[in-house]
Amino acid sequence: MQFTSLAKSLALGATLLAALAAPVAAQVKEHTFKVGIGLSDDHQQAQAVRHFAERLQAKSGGKMNAKLFASGALGNDVSMTSALRGGTLEMTIPDSSTLMSLIKPFGVLNLPLTFNNEAEADAVLDGPFGQKLLAMLPDKGLIGLGFWENGFRHVTNSRRAINTADDLAGLKLRVIQSPLFLDTFNALGTNATPMPFTELYTAMEQKAVDGQENPPATILASKFYEVQKHLVLSRHMYSAWVLLISKKTWDGLSADEKKIVQEAAREATVFERKTIRAFSETALGELKKAGMQITELPAAEQAKLRT
């Protein structure tokens, strides 16, 4: 009898804990958020979006979901961010530099050689400074749910090996559509050319540009090794993405629904950083196997990139 009573008590306790652990299902409505990204469906960013969708579904009893649209199907970073502000798209994950035209302090994150390693970046982005940046977004029609890692950026090109900072001079490099990127690379003597990411592969294939700059994971996933011979480990900038949701969408959610989205976003952020860092460790080896010639700038040469 005592055993039966104990079992019943434990079962009741478990039921109560389950009820307290998540919002009441009846208070959560059905929502499907379209998430547009410029990168390919097999990129680590896309994997993290799918993880976010899984966590949304699990936490909402299947009522909330996120649907991925990859490879620029819904536009580029600039146009998709604009769509969020207008309320015609629910979510996107642009490079932080995309937000500089709306909020200038976001440009600080893309200054050359700002961070020495990922731990420093995490401390800044997850700390008071990063949170202050996110707090500026609602006035622009956006809600920031966290910072995802793109990684340290490196230069590739089809013309020559880069062994010194001066070797960059004269190269026509595609850069992000941001005044900061344009000014930085023009100062280094390159012909900086702003261009949507979705147009980049074809532009390199047709020799419209000599090269570009991105982290190893993106270089590999986008198969840039097919049209680029040289990669220099320049580590000239650390690049972060911002997980965004439209404020119009956000304002239409209940308190319980917002909590679910925030919790799923936090878990997806941890997943994304872990996944892309693990992949980046192997990406350089894969790029070398694919035929890319990889050089590394000496510390003294890298310091010259701090323009």
PLM features per residue range, with description:
Residues 20-26:
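Sec/Tat signal peptide C-region and signal peptidase I cleavage site
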